Amino acid sequence: MVVRALVRAHPLSRISCRYSSLAASSFNPKPYIPSVSGVQKSLPFDNLLEQYSRVHWDDTVTYDDPTVQRLFKNLMSGSRAALASAITLVESRHPTKRAQGNMLLKMVLDEEREKYKKYGRDSMIFRVGISGSPGVGKSSFIEALGAELTENRGKKVAVLTIDPTSAMTGGSVLGDLTRMQELSRNPRAYIRQSPTSGSLGGVTRGIHEAVILCEGAGYDIVIIETVGVGQSETSVSDMCDMMCLLLSPAHGDELQGVKRGIMEMSDLLVVTKDDGDLQAKAKMTQAEYISALKFMRPRLDVWSPKVMRSSIMNKESVSAVCTSLYEFWDTIGESGDLERRRQDQMKKWMWNHVKDEIMAVFQKHPKIIHLKNHKIFINLLLQAPKLEKDISSGKITPGLAAETMIRTFFGV
């Protein structure tokens, strides 16, 4: 019973080597598979793999699904409520909701493909990623930029913000709406906050699909605000047409605080807070980055990154940044880089999803949580604590430990 209780919870680190001598006849528990809601499901022994598949995938959803049809109709009419519900579907890990989200995405993509044939690049949404260190003023800058785009340029703006998730509680503050109150009340703007949920790269799972849904809802530009600056932050550039890096003039030598990777991926650098006593520092920071960029190869042959200064107190400076955004948009559109970049991004995100799915499948596979194939199971249980100990003592790398577990799983 003790072994059964330990196995049903399956914390790999709690089962020690004293169970290695137990015979196969000692193991006869009911296997379980955790559902997406976190509730453990007891499954009968027969047809385990088939039922396991149902936990992960739902093949019963079709084009005629009433939820899909309702959301698609309302989404095409520009409903913000439908857009919010659709993004919730594609972010969900529930098999039925995820299947509905995928079906909805396919219908939206079909519709957008027809629009592209008719209107060309004018039917495409402009994807702008904005990153910067905490406190640089990302939310304030986005609100000022959104006001310029909606009020003076007649654009519909979607803002997707990513907030960090607590590693201890799994919670997230999601406080960007409190910093964008004016934009959140703008009928031509939509703001969606999402937690990272442990995802690396400053973005969250489903954000690429959310961009597609915003395009289907008729928005002209989507602004993606990331968690903050870091070397893994460069993955946000894999879903954007343009990367904008915000810099603060108040932190001394900014060149020491910004990673080279994010600079190389940036198409526009903006020094914020260019007003009052900080104007002199803003000019100095601008000069430093102009000099630094001379030693970096531009990401695109048709565009050289610019370094600008801006202040939310000065609407003309915000308008100048907006002009540079669309100058970039026109340049890559006319050169053909836009279409090529979008195609490459779709391929990269396919492999990103493959990695996520493989991890989920590996953790919940019957070979891991079911004891009929007890040799593989026991080997994994016994290996994990030893591998963790070897990693802590520096005997092996985490990569080698992961490869060892996967090879054991597949019996290689």
UniProtKB/Swiss-Prot annotation:
Q: What is its EC number?
A: 3.6.-.-
Keyword flag Mitochondrion: yes
* Coarse class of the protein's main subcellular location: mitochondrion
Q: What does this protein do?
A: May have GTPase activity. May also bind and hydrolyze ATP. May function as chaperone. Likely to have a role in propionyl-CoA metabolism and adenosylcobalamin synthesis.
| Keywords annotated in UniProt | ATP-binding, Chaperone, GTP-binding, Hydrolase, Mitochondrion, Nucleotide-binding, Transit peptide
- Once renumbered to this chain, the transit peptide range reads 1-15
State one Pfam family annotation.
MeaB
Entry GO CC: cytoplasm; mitochondrion
- One MF term in the entry's GO annotations: GTP binding
Q: Which residues bind GTP?
A: 132-140, 275, 311-313
Recorded protein name is: Methylmalonic aciduria type A homolog, mitochondrial
Family statement drawn from the similarity comment of this UniProt entry: Belongs to the SIMIBI class G3E GTPase family. ArgK/MeaB subfamily.
Instruction: Specify the enzyme's EC class, one word.
Output: hydrolase
- Localization terms from the record: Mitochondrion
